[in-house]
Amino acid sequence: MNIVCYGLQWGDEGKGKVTTYLSREFDYVVRYSGGSNAGHTVNYGEFKLVHHLVPSFDIRGNTKAYIANGVVVDLDVLIKEIEEIKKIGFDVYDRINISSLTHIVLPVHKMLDEKLEIAKGEKAVGTTKRGIGPAYADKVHRIGLRLVDLFDKETALEKLKFISKMYKNLYGIEWDDYEILFENFEKLSRIIVPPLEMKEELKNANVLFEGTQGVLLDIDMGSYPYVTGSYCNTTGVESGLGFPIKIDKRIGVFKAYVTRVGKGPFPTELFGEEAEKIRIAGREFGATTGRPRRCGWLDLPILRYAIETSGCDEMIMTKADILSGLEKVKVGIRYLSNGRKFEIPNDISMIDKVTVEYIEFNGWKNLEDDNFAKFVDFIERETGLKIAYISTGEKIDDIRKV
């Protein structure tokens, strides 16, 4: 069986924990998009890991991992992650493969990312400055460097010199320290494989595809221009993988409230003491940047939008425990714009111009409370989808089947 596990909001839904929990039943976990801008936190109890590039698979088991060519890879970050895992007693080099067609994030990409954010001023997107957008841009400009290019050092050096010249002439960015790149490549060369080799490997395997960010950050279907540089919707699986594959189920992960990092529209956003209470209780600070996340009430119109555009089959709810103890919990149920009501936005670009109609629930003391059961039932009715699992805490096994 092949399943996609992905985010239904603006990322940070708890996909890392959920994917790691589900991974035990699969032969492979495959990352198909994004880069080191992802920050998937996994709490094993005795230790905690933050995955930026290593797919979220249970390192204590037998599941293998694959980084497909839809991902852009910072070799330094990937090596450091693998080495960090090794330090706690798990050598995963023999359980990870990476596509030879994967594009590489270079130092010039990070420099340009920062320059662009500064140049945009108040219109800055609020990127992680990890060079993800510029790396994808070079891929589209057909000047990007792939892992396969590094097998021929002489040709790779020619390409690197050309890239350096372009960045110096166009942006005033200088970089010519190529040797570290080749050193990192040597460390990873034995795990690099052609996509068609992985096609054979995955043909008869049970595969869990791990989404990064969330549908609302997808380069096409997200809240553009406040989005990431990749296809993080379920539609990105096959393009990111490089070959067709049958998807049996799409499982969308959402938080019982909403957060987002950086700028962009956020119809149900909370401010002041209300927002800070949720932010502190939920530890809502970016795993990649450490930035405080913006917090707000659950937004059903935008959740329905994400469900429709991704073909979601069932959902997993996370962080409902964070709302335990609140006297009242609100849910945005529809948008109001120019005298009209919207259950789901036809055009996501409209959401910065709407007001929100809310419904209020009595709060719950814990997740066994009848008030919480009413909250869950309401969401299932309003979305038309079953909530298959509910996360009950921070650790991997703090999750229950509904």
From Swiss-Prot:
One of its GO terms (cellular component) is cytoplasm. CDD domains: AdSS. Binds 1 Mg(2+) ion per subunit. IMP binds at D12, E13, G14, K15, N37, A38, G39, H40, T128, R142, Q213, T228, R291. Its EC number is 6.3.4.4. Its cofactor is Mg(2+). GO terms for biological process: 'de novo' AMP biosynthetic process; IMP metabolic process. It is found in: Cytoplasm. Mg(2+) binds at D12, G39. Pathway: Purine metabolism; AMP biosynthesis via de novo pathway; AMP from IMP: step 1/2. It holds the Pfam family Adenylsucc_synt. The active site is at D12 (proton acceptor), H40 (proton donor). The keyword RNA-binding does not apply. It is an enzyme of class 6 (ligase). Substrate binds at A287, T288, T289, G290, R291, P292, R293. Homodimer. This is Adenylosuccinate synthetase. It comes from Fervidobacterium nodosum (strain ATCC 35602 / DSM 5306 / Rt17-B1).
